[in-house]
């Protein structure tokens, strides 16, 4: 039962008790029932707020992956190896979800050292000047069963643009049998144009569109 449904049930009880109070002339019963009503109302308030959960991104089980066309004939793939951040999520009201995530741009890895050094250089990401990539959500919409559209501000190379993440999940929470904490997972995708972020090096050689895939695992302590 969702918090809204529990609240509605509690108010039905309150209405029934009010009707009883009106027809009951015994002071003791009136006092007892009044206390009951107060407890129900207060309990409803706490219950409605109890569903909000704060989850931490697990860097060891999260991958920020990208793909980009090379010369228009093949695709280069890689990843950033360290992602951190916080997700606030209410299972009963997914539209209230929010994300504040940071990617360590210095961990760029495409499995070719020369290329990785070039991408980290001022030619592309300039990680010495802009060591992080950040995403902060501004709006969340339920797109369907188990799917969300999360709009937010993505900052790369010192430039901030609005993007939309298509999210599958989060999954139901499970308890980690080894660590004892709770875990959920989600997958998010989006596409950006690197030129929008002031990264214009090697046109025609490196594609403009960057496909981004985020496989995220989140954790929080078990109650």
Residue ranges of each PLM-predicted region?
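Short, basic/polar N-terminal leader/transit segment immediately after the initiator methionine
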Residues: 3-5, 24-27, 52-53
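N-terminal amphipathic/basic-hydrophobic helices that include classical n-h-c signal peptides
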Residues: 1-21
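Short helix-onset patch at the extreme N-terminus, typifying the N->h transition
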Residues: 7-8, 27-30, 214
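Bacterial N-terminal signal peptides
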Residues: 34-45
């Amino acid at each position: 039962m969702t918090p809204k449904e529990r609240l509605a049930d509690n108010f039905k009880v309150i209405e029934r008790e009010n009707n009883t109070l009106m027809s009951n002339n015994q002071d003791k019963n009136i006092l007892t029932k009044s206390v009951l009503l107060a407890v129900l109302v207060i309990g409803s308030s706490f219950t409605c707020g109890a569903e909000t959960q704060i989850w931490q991104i697990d860097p060891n089980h999260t991958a920020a992956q990208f793909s980009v066309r090379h010369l228009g004939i093949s695709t280069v793939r890689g990843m950033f190896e360290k992602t951190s951040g916080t997700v606030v999520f209410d299972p009963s009201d997914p539209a209230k979800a929010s994300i504040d995530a940071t990617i360590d741009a210095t961990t760029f890895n495409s499995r070719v050292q020369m290329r990785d050094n070039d991408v980290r250089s001022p030619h592309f990401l300039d990680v010495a000047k802009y060591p992080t990539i950040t995403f902060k959500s501004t709006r969340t919409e339920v797109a369907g069963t188990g799917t969300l559209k999360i709009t937010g501000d993505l900052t790369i190379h010192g430039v901030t643009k609005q993007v939309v993440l298509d999210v599958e999940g989060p999954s139901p929470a499970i308890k980690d049998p080894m660590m004892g904490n709770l875990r959920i997972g989600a997958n998010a995708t989006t596409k950006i144009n690197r030129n929008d972020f002031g990264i214009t090096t090697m046109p025609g050689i490196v594609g403009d569109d960057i496909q981004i895939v985020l496989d995220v695992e989140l954790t929080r302590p078990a109650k």
